[in-house]
Amino acid sequence: MIVAEIYTQADGKITGFSIDGHSGTAPRGQDIYCAGVSTVSQAAYICIYEHLKRSFQGNFGNGKLSLILNNPPDEATEAVFQTMLIGIREIEKIAPQAVKLIVKPQTLSVGSPINQDLPKIS
């Protein structure tokens, strides 16, 4: 199962996310649910990194993707994160056996390291 955790601060604004797992509904590389969750979450990660140029700690690779902002969320990051959240929520609605979405308060403080060795996205 794909587990998508969305982290929020006290006011509900999204501070980051973590995606892990495989839906198990088809072989790797052929799974539409994995492709959908991967697409919306990678698009958010790349947008925060390349377009918004926000500072964050994250992990990208080996079937896992995570991002925690180094600074409080703003209107632009919230728009990106909410778009991702809506996409994952819709996939979960049609495939609850494959995708589990969890929205929860962030337990790490903004800027806490997840992985210091971030790969370059080209």
Predicted features along the sequence, with ranges:
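Short, conserved glycine- and acidic-residue-centered signature motifs
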Residues: 33-37
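N-terminal intrinsically disordered, cationic/polar leader segments
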Residues: 1-32, 42, 46-122
